[in-house]
Swiss-Prot record:
<dbReference type="InterPro" id="IPR036150">
    <property type="entry name" value="Cyt_b/b6_C_sf"/>
</dbReference>
<feature type="transmembrane region" description="Helical">
    <location>
        <begin position="178"/>
        <end position="198"/>
    </location>
</feature>
<dbReference type="InterPro" id="IPR005798">
    <property type="entry name" value="Cyt_b/b6_C"/>
</dbReference>
<dbReference type="Pfam" id="PF00033">
    <property type="entry name" value="Cytochrome_B"/>
</dbReference>
<dbReference type="InterPro" id="IPR027387">
    <property type="entry name" value="Cytb/b6-like_sf"/>
</dbReference>
<keyword id="KW-0408">Iron</keyword>
<comment type="subunit">
    <text>The cytochrome bc1 complex contains 11 subunits: 3 respiratory subunits (MT-CYB, CYC1 and UQCRFS1), 2 core proteins (UQCRC1 and UQCRC2) and 6 low-molecular weight proteins (UQCRH/QCR6, UQCRB/QCR7, UQCRQ/QCR8, UQCR10/QCR9, UQCR11/QCR10 and a cleavage product of UQCRFS1). This cytochrome bc1 complex then forms a dimer.</text>
</comment>
<feature type="transmembrane region" description="Helical">
    <location>
        <begin position="347"/>
        <end position="367"/>
    </location>
</feature>
<dbReference type="InterPro" id="IPR005797">
    <property type="entry name" value="Cyt_b/b6_N"/>
</dbReference>
<comment type="similarity">
    <text>Belongs to the cytochrome b family.</text>
</comment>
<keyword id="KW-0249">Electron transport</keyword>
<keyword id="KW-0812">Transmembrane</keyword>
<dbReference type="InterPro" id="IPR048259">
    <property type="entry name" value="Cytochrome_b_N_euk/bac"/>
</dbReference>
<feature type="binding site" description="axial binding residue">
    <location>
        <position position="97"/>
    </location>
    <ligand>
        <name>heme b b566</name>
    </ligand>
</feature>
<dbReference type="GO" id="GO:0008121">
    <property type="term" value="F:ubiquinol-cytochrome-c reductase activity"/>
</dbReference>
<feature type="binding site" description="axial binding residue">
    <location>
        <position position="196"/>
    </location>
    <ligand>
        <name>heme b b566</name>
    </ligand>
</feature>
<keyword id="KW-0830">Ubiquinone</keyword>
Length: 381
């Protein structure tokens, strides 16, 4: 009798994706983050669904409905904080996943990488709209400031902003449509994830050496299922520690004040995972220039395959590029710190220098270091 796992039209897809999938024998824990992102997405969809059952997307009751969830709904506080901190965990995993891809040259899988960049943009859009829903001060002003950036687009800017707002300011129409989009986008993300995996399984996974691993493959199950399970346990442990002991650690106290269009908070800033991009936006005095730099700070990832000059795929054996890579990581941490600081001396100049070095490292220094390393190895003949 043939195994149902290998014959059933639906089960065999799962079999080829998660059970009998040939995987490189040497992929490290940096390859765990894909499955952890899948877990994060599932947690967010489930907790989000239960939150949506009690939430009301009306300006007069949105803030109260979130308070009601936390006070009156059975385990509502748990669901709410799992959802809020789950987003932070999602972004931690995303940044590590992208960082892994950059370090080991996974961006040479063009289709997989480009879908990944689209996924990153989509998740960022979803997180931004989700932050608006509790209708606290930072929700309202964050929505006002970020949507207002579109007014920098020549000619159609102002019309576009008012069209997105559904009026002349961020109001009921804005909140309702943001709720609708925040609800639908995770399902679009899920569809994109399937496409992401589809393209990945066309080529197979990369590995730390960046070399072809066709000669040395092992089945995904049980080797990597058990490895992913360990990662999942660590993720859940970290998330629940955050939720149960430090639920407001990454949140903004201003969001416990109901939205008030007549009172601007002293420092408008987004959630921590957007601070690096926010710092780049603020470092350019021109509005349109800032918006373009903001978009480019993420879109630059799509250009990585074309900026790869080395004959080696991975950075594993490329010490000069490694130094630049870790400088870039440190630089992003500086940008994240600056994004949360007020616009005054010395933070302005630090932010501008960090923004310049961010783009310089990726666009100029890394491609040059790739060429230098090839010359040192006498590979550039």
């Amino acid at each position: 009798m043939t195994n149902i796992r290998k014959t059933h039209p639906l089960i065999k897809i799962i079999n080829h994706s998660f059970i009998d999938l040939p995987a490189p024998s040497n992929i490290s824990s940096w390859w765990n983050f894909g499955s952890l992102l899948g877990l994060c997405l599932m947690i967010q969809i489930i907790t989000g669904l239960f939150l949506a059952m009690h939430y009301t997307s009306d300006t007069t009751t949105a803030f109260s409905s979130v308070a009601h969830i936390c006070r009156d709904v059975n385990y509502g506080w748990l669901i709410r904080y799992m959802h809020a901190n789950g987003a932070s965990m999602f972004f931690i995993c995303l940044f590590l996943h992208v960082g892994r891809g950059m370090y080991y040259g996974s961006y040479t899988f063009m289709e997989t990488w480009n879908i990944g960049v689209i996924l990153l943009f989509t998740v960022m859009a979803t997180a931004f709209m989700g932050y608006v829903l509790p209708w606290g001060q930072m929700s309202f002003w964050g929505a006002t400031v970020i949507t207002n950036l579109l007014s920098a687009i020549p000619y159609i800017g102002t019309t576009l902003v008012e069209w997105i707002w559904g009026g002349f300011s961020v109001d009921k129409a804005t909140l309702t449509r943001f709720f609708a989009f925040h609800f639908i986008l995770p399902f679009i993300i899920t569809a994109l994830v399937i496409v992401h995996l589809l393209f990945l399984h066309e080529t197979g996974s990369n590995n730390p050496t960046g070399l072809n691993s066709d000669a040395d493959k092992i089945p995904f199950h049980p080797y990597y299922t058990i490895k992913d399970l360990l990662g999942a346990l660590i993720l859940i442990l970290s998330l629940m520690t955050m939720v149960l002991f430090f639920p407001d650690l990454l949140g903004d106290p201003d969001n416990y004040t109901p939205a008030n269009p007549l009172n601007t908070p002293p420092h408008i800033k987004p959630e921590w995972y957007f601070l690096f991009a926010y710092a780049i936006l603020r470092s350019i005095p021109n509005k349109l220039g800032g918006v373009l730099a903001l978009i480019l700070s993420i879109l630059i990832l799509a250009f990585l395959p074309f900026l790869h000059t080395s004959k080696q795929r991975s950075m594993m054996f490329r010490p000069i590029t490694q130094v630049l890579y870790w400088l870039l990581v440190a630089n992003l941490l500086v940008l994240t710190w600056i994004g949360g600081q007020p616009v005054e001396h010395p933070f302005i100049i630090i932010g501008q220098l960090a923004s310049i070095s961010y783009f310089s490292i990726i666009l100029i220094l890394m491609p040059i270091s790739g060429i230098i390393e090839d010359k040192l190895l006498k590979w550039s003949l």
